[in-house]
């Protein structure tokens, strides 16, 4: 059995302008499997002020600085992220390899990657976003989150609705996203897509068949060209927010397997993970 102390740290990056609360429901299982996990909070990306635009290059630079400050050459890590966070994880991994930086990246996990915005819930009006980009309106237009909020489970979805009724921020992130953030996320994915072929470490992709934001067909199109270094797992019981939805337990176990945690591992003390009211409600 592998010594748990030798396992890489799983470094998780949340989705666009959200927070580590997106991982609250998978944290308990990761801890029970003996996985050392931490969350990367990125200035200008984590709970970003939508009135102060930042670019994807700013996000990547800030994330790189956070890695440099936290992890040294003797600390192997696996980078993972949800939605846009997955693209940041892949970009970081290629950056670390290209620049001979001190971290030892052992793998990348992309959860619900948005290689293309082509999910079933998106109407033809989504194409108008490009007009907003072209006219320079991205700074003033916001997009309201709406049902199903990336969640198939009706009980959890109702809880998120109540969170949004009380606040502009919920377990899945802010109630509105600025158009400039969406534009920068698309630019980030355009940067990452060609880099995946040269990704120097194993890639795990977890994606829901019924993802309403990005179709599984689009994800399959990109991962199928990567060969044996990439593994795509299609989840059958969730929408986009797979760390919160019905498949959250499988997501946690797949991540634990990916970092090499023994299946019969006993939990060890870890830094306290964020606990949302949703996590307390579902537990």
Range-by-range predicted roles:
Residues 38, 219-220, 224-241:
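Catalytic histidine neighborhood in serine/cysteine hydrolases
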Residues 231, 236-283:
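Catalytic active-site module of serine/aspartate enzymes centered on a nucleophile-bearing elbow/loop
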Residues 199, 205-207, 211:
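Short beta-strand/loop motif that positions the catalytic acidic residue
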Residues 212-218:
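Conserved alpha/beta-hydrolase "acid-adjacent" motif
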Residues 87-91, 95-175:
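Alpha/beta-hydrolase-fold enzymes
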Residues 177-195:
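Active-site nucleophile elbow and catalytic-triad environment of alpha/beta-hydrolase enzymes
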Residues 27-49:
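Conserved alpha/beta-hydrolase
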Residues 16-27:
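The serine-hydrolase catalytic nucleophile loop
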């Amino acid at each position: 059995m592998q010594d748990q102390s030798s396992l890489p740290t799983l470094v998780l990056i949340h989705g666009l302008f959200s927070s580590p609360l997106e991982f609250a429901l998978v944290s308990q299982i990761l801890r029970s499997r003996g996985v050392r996990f931490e969350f990367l909070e990125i200035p200008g990306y984590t709970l970003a002020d939508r009135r102060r635009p930042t670019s994807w290059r700013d996000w990547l630079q800030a994330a790189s600085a956070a890695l440099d400050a936290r992890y040294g050459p003797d600390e192997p890590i696996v980078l993972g992220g949800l939605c846009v966070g997955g693209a940041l994880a892949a970009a970081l991994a290629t950056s670390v390899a290209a620049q001979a930086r001190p971290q030892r990246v052992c793998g990348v996990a992309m959860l619900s990657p948005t290689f293309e915005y082509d999910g079933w819930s998106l109407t033809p009006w989504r194409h108008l976003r490009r007009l907003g980009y072209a006219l320079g309106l991205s700074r003033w237009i916001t997009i309201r989150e709406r049902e199903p909020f990336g969640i198939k489970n009706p009980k959890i979805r109702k809880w998120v609705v109540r969170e949004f009724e009380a606040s502009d921020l919920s377990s899945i992130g802010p109630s509105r996203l600025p158009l400039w953030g969406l534009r920068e996320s698309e630019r980030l994915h355009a940067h990452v897509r060609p880099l995946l072929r040269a990704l120097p470490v194993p890639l795990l992709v977890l994606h829901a068949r019924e993802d309403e934001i990005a179709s599984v067909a689009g994800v399959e199109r990109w991962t199928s060209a990567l060969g044996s270094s990439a593994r795509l797992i299609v989840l059958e019981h969730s929408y986009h927010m797979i760390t919160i939805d019905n498949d959250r337990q499988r997501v946690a176990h797949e991540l634990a397997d990916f970092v090499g945690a023994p299946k019969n591992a006993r939990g060890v003390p870890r830094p306290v993970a964020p606990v949302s009211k949703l996590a307390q409600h579902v537990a």
